[in-house]
Structure formats: C-alpha cells, structure tokens
C-alpha cells in the first residue's frame, strides 16, 4: 500500500461546528442533517416567568453549594464533605469544604489556536504515545499490519477511535494503572485502502465489529517522568467488541421489547456499539454509554407497523440501507427482519476491569437513549446517583437514584451486592426554568438584567422498578423508549447535553452542551435561558446545584458557567472573568476535574477555525471563568476522554486526519508516525518536565 504525503485540507461544507462531512458520516450517520427526532412542543426554559423577580430573590437567599461525595475521572472517590449552605455566588471558605478549599487557578502559558499536525502542549510539558489503534494487547495477537488486517487480529488489538478513558489504581502495584478505553466508531475510508462504500466486504465488516467496543489494558509509569507505557499481554488486558456477549439486567430484562429470534428470552445481547462518555463507580467498575447506535441499522423504511415505525423514528432510525451495510452480513442489523434488535442498544454498559472473565452488562434501569455520560455521586447514606445526557439536538438531561446503599470494601459479598445497585432505583428527567422575563432572552446571547443566565429546576420521575409515573406507558416502555416518556412529562429540550461531571470538591454538577445549529430555526425550539443563543455554533457549560446539598433531591438551582465562542463575540460569557484574558473555546464535549477543583474541557468540532484542544478553567475564586488552552490535537482530530491527575494528563486523540477528501491513499494527516504511515487514533500522556503538579 502506497501512502502519499498528507494534503492539508480545510472544511468548507456546511456541517455544524468545525466537523468534516467525513466525521459526520461515520460518527453519527449525519444526525444533524436528518429531521430532529424530538418533534414535541414541550415547554422551554424561560416559558414559565410568572413571579420572576420574587422567585429570583427567594432562590438567592436559599441557594446551596452541594458538598457530597463525587467520582472524578480517576479511580479515587472523594470522601463526603461537610454540608454548606451559602448564597449563590458568595465567597466560600475552607471551613465549608467548598470551592475555595485548596482551589488554585491555572498557571501555564496557554497554547495559541493553531492548525498544527501534531499534539501541541503548553511550554514546559512533555508527551508520549501510550497506545495506537491496532497495537496488540492480548496474548497471541499479532503486530498491526495495515495491509493484512483481519477480524481475528483486531479482536486482540487496541480498537479504533478511542474516546472515554477511565484510570484505576492497580492493586499492590504502585507504578501500574488499569486503563479502560472505549472505541466510539470506525471510519472505513481511513482504515481500508480502496474502500468501496457501496460494496464493503464481510471481512471489512467483521474487522469493524472487532474495532468497536472497549479495551482494558495495564500501563506502567516511568518513575522519573510522567511517561506511561502500555503493558501488552497483561493478565488483566481484555477486548470487548460488537460481538461480545452482554447480560441484560434491571427492570426491562426479559421484556418482550428486547426479545429477538436469536435471543427469545431478551436477556443476552451480542456486543456494544458507539460507546462515548462514561464513568467510574465507587465500587470499581466502569460505565460506558452507547450513543449513536441508530446508524448501524438498515431497512427501517420496510417496517409497516405504525407504532414500531414511530418508535424507531424517535430514535433516529429511518430510511433504507445503513452506511456500513452490516445488514448484508448479519440480519440482526436489518430492522425489517429484527425490529427489536435496535432496542438492545442505547444503554449504559458496565464492565469489571479486574475480572477479565466477567460478563459485561447492559443496565436497563438507567433508560435507553443516546447516552453520552454516566457520572456517579453518592448520597450521604451511600446510595449512588448517576447523571446522564442524551446527545441529540433538543433532547434531555437525566439522573438515576439507586434505592440501595453501597457496601464498602472489596469482599466477594460487597462486590456481588454492589453490582446490583444500578438495577433498582428511580429514573428522572430534568425540567429547567429560567428566572428572567422572556423579553430579556432574545436569542442573541445578551445577558439578562440580573447579569447571569440562571434559574431553578425540578426532577420529574419517570419510573421506579415496575412502577411507571408516565401516563399511558408501562414501566418497561419507559425504560426502553425513555425519550418518548420524557416527551410526555414536559422535560426541557437542551442543546445536545453531552458529558456531565460532578465537582469532587463541591458536588456541583457541570453539563457540557456542545452546540445546536437548529436552536431558534423556523418551527424549532426558540432560545431560552439555559440555551440562550439561536443557531448555537459554540455551545455552553451549565452549572447545577442540587437542593439541600442532596444529589437525590427533587429540585435544583442552575446557572450558565460558560457561554463559549470567540471572546470578542458579545454573546460569549466566561463566568464573569474579563473576556480579553481568556482562550477562545468552541464546542465543549468531555469534561473532568483536577484535584484543585479546576474544570478541564475537551472540544469536538471547533467552529472557530482551529484544531480541537483541551482547556482548563478555574471554577471558583478570583480566576473563576479564566479559560486557558492546555493543548491542541492534530489536524482533523477530536480531543476525547481527558484524565487530569496530579502528575499526568491523558487524552484520546480520536479520528486524526478525518477531513473531507481524505483516504488511506491520500491522507490529510501524518500523525502519529510521520509521512508514509497510516494515520492512527491513539492515546497520549502529557506531563510536566519539572515533575510538579499539572496546570498549577
């Protein structure tokens, strides 16, 4: 195979943000260019404005800063902190255990926007590649050979398009860590020379099945630097693919809605697809959300039952042949033959990284939609609470509150008990209510008179166990068709809620709302206080504080922390920080926290003409809102799955070189191995050369 030198391209098409048409084609099946699945007339934030002034006064007198336990991007779990009730925006103290306790701003020199075809890091930092697509991680797996790929080889090699990453401490091994990394999607044009989209081969399809899923691998730390190196063929290393058996658990397990000809019991599913954001549970398992699963299924237009067709359409499943044509090689991807197979995707999956023989699970109590995140917290009495976004234009934000308490320890009894915690509880959807008069929210992004986009909200219950709270729907229907249930109860339409992260210091929950080109368009939802800009190209980050400092509360307060874009754009807002002192940022996607309470944001589809990157921002103190760019990824790439530890940052560099017109033979990037080599998604570690903590 002859690979030419990379040809630098720009994207001049009309795709949203800065994404290429190639990315949209393979990642989400051109979701933004299909009809919006949510066609309801649900109320929007800002519609309820009666008594706005008095409500604002009441809220500000009683607002709280949450201080419950939280789980971040690393394996450790913060201890429960003391409750603190403070006025919104008021200074907090070390005594309260909230924002200012140990909080620091970020002290590196920001990286300038660029179009470099490398990972560009802040001055004083080093980097190395931890693992590339195709590198062997299992015993017997061969070295990667781009000209001789096979499904068998790929099943033992690191998967394609790395996204979410979890890092857990290796028991009894101080300088080793367990990495769990999921693989969102495949781009066959950049994987296979001479790929014919109209006539893919069975081998290409089976390689793609093996390149999806998750990888579990152990990595070793260099004690003299922050370098991290994958340990190939470690006993804990594992691949989970699109053909790995999964157990279905929770209240919808065995439902008629999940039964197929291959699985008449409705309790065993082959594989997981389009994994995106996730989370680490306090008991040491890893969660991963199935997102744009709809694109893998073909022939929905042949479904004649109107109820089934309407349900499929609400999940974006329509039309004829799928992009990858998998229905030609396995009938489960043919909706006309197996209409229930689609219902077996769109779940949060759970995997035990310390037991390579365990069966991964699909958790039906958490609802079915395009899951982007599954971030846990603990209540004071030890019940896990999960926050989840549905990454679609005008879809919703959810949480799940378990009815069972976590058992501490790592005994067999504790592990068996804790693996049931996410099967029993209550599923909720959020309704956001603004506190400003409607006339002050005009779609321009101009701040209302009170100086903030803020308000209150409530959690609307959908189902608990076998009980449905949604009129006209059974509990099983609520879990399997969660979008339809949320439609019925009047949940708030959001601008693509993606990653969610509770602060380990305060418990406040941060939600990345990536963008929404259709906000305010004719016949579409208008701007509201939580989504204040029409044709929202750049996105925003919302900050949510649960009532009474309790993650299980039925109400909350909220405010927009960042309204992203070019600082010179009058519609942007950076937590009140001077806009001439921040880095431009567009399309926030994955988020995480460091130990000092700083929020780190990776971007997807930068609409400002620069490469995507990783940004840090203080969430408290005098530097709250000071956004600083820490790194950029190569041409065409997205920054995914950031993990910020004291001495190391990990980022997944997804779809490098995925620019319009690119192919294996005519690449748009030479990363990571230089000209003449195949472009390969990879994981990168970054560290401070002086050995000090990252960012501060």
Language model region names:
Residues 153-167, 264-277, 488-499, 577-592, ...:
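Signature of short aromatic-glycine-proline-rich micro-motifs recurring in repeat-based ectodomains
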Residues 51, 57-83:
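N-terminal export signals
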Residues 184-208, 294-339, 402-405, 515-536, ...:
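Short, conserved, GDST-rich strand-edge loop motifs in beta-rich repeat architectures
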Residues 580-620:
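Loop/turn-rich, solvent-exposed surfaces of beta-rich toroidal or solenoidal domains
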Residues 116-132, 140-153, 224-266, 351-368, ...:
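Blade-edge beta-strand/turn elements of extracellular beta-propeller
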């Amino acid at each position: 195979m002859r690979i030419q030198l990379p040809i630098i391209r720009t994207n001049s098409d009309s795709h949203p943000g800065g994404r290429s048409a190639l990315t949209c084609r393979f990642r989400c099946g051109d979701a933004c260019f299909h009809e919006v699945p949510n066609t309801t007339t649900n109320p929007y934030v800002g519609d309820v404005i009666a008594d706005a002034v008095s409500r604002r006064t009441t809220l500000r007198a009683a607002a709280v800063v949450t201080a419950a336990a939280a789980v971040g991007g690393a394996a450790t779990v913060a201890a429960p902190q003391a409750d603190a009730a403070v006025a919104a925006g008021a200074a907090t103290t070390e005594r309260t255990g909230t924002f200012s306790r140990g909080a620091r701003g970020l002290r590196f020199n920001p990286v300038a926007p660029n179009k470099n075809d490398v990972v560009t890091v802040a001055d004083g930092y080093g980097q190395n590649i931890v693992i590339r697509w195709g590198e062997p991680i299992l015993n017997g797996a061969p070295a990667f050979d781009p000209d001789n790929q096979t499904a068998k080889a790929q099943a033992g090699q690191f998967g394609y398009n790395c996204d979410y990453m979890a890092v857990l401490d290796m028991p009894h091994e101080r300088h080793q860590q367990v990495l769990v990394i999921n693989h969102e999607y495949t781009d066959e044009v950049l994987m296979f020379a001479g790929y014919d989209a109209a006539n893919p081969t069975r081998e290409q399809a089976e390689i793609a099945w093996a390149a999806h899923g998750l990888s579990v691998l152990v990595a070793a730390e260099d004690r003299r630097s922050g370098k991290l190196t994958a340990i190939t063929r470690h006993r804990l290393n594992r691949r989970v693919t699109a053909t790995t058996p999964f157990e279905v658990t929770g209240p919808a397990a065995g439902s008629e809605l999940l039964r197929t000809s291959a699985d008449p019991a409705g309790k065993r599913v082959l594989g997981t697809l389009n994994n995106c954001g996730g989370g680490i549970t306090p008991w040491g398992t890893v969660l991963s959300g199935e997102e744009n699963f709809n694109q893998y299924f073909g022939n929905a237009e042949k479904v004649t039952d109107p109820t089934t067709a309407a349900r499929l359409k609400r999940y974006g499943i329509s039309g004829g042949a799928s992009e990858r044509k998998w229905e030609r090689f396995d009938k489960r991807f043919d909706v006309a033959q197996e209409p229930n197979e689609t219902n077996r995707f769109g779940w949060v999956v759970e995997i035990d990284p310390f037991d390579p023989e365990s069966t991964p699970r699909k958790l039906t109590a958490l609802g079915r939609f395009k899951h982007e995140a599954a971030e846990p917290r603990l209540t004071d009495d030890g019940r896990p609470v999960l926050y989840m976004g549905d990454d679609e234009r005008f879809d919703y934000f959810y949480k799940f509150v378990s009815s069972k308490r976590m058992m501490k320890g790592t005994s067999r009894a504790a592990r068996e008990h804790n693996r049931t915690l996410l099967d029993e509880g209550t599923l909720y959807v959020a309704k956001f209510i603004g506190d400003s008069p409607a006339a002050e929210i005009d779609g321009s992004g101009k701040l209302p008179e009170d100086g903030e986009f803020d308000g209150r909200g409530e959690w609307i219950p959908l189902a608990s166990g076998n009980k449905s709270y949604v009129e006209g729907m059974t509990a099983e229907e609520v879990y399997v068709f969660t979008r339809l249930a949320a439609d019925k109860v009047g949940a708030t339409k959001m601008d693509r809620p993606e990653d969610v992260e509770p602060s380990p210091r305060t418990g406040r929950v941060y939600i990345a709302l990536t963008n929404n080109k259709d906000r305010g368009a004719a016949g579409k939802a208008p701007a509201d206080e939580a989504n204040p800009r029409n044709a929202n190209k750049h996105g925003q980050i919302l900050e949510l504080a649960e009532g009474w400092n309790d993650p299980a509360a039925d109400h909350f307060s909220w405010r927009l922390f960042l309204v992203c874009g070019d600082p010179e754009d009058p519609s942007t807002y950076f937590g009140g920080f001077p806009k001439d002192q921040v880095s431009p940022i567009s399309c926030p996607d994955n988020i995480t926290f460091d130990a000092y309470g700083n929020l780190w944001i990776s971007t997807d589809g930068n609409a400002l003409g620069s490469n995507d990157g990783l940004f840090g921002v203080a969430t408290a103190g005098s530097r709250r809102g000071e956004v600083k760019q820490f790194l950029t990824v190569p041409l065409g790439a997205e920054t995914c799955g950031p993990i910020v530890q004291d001495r190391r940052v990990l980022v997944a560099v997804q779809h490098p070189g995925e620019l319009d017109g690119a192919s294996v033979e005519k690449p748009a990037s030479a990363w990571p191995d230089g000209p003449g080599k195949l472009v390969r998604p990879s994981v990168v570690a970054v560290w401070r050369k002086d050995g000090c903590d990252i960012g501060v």
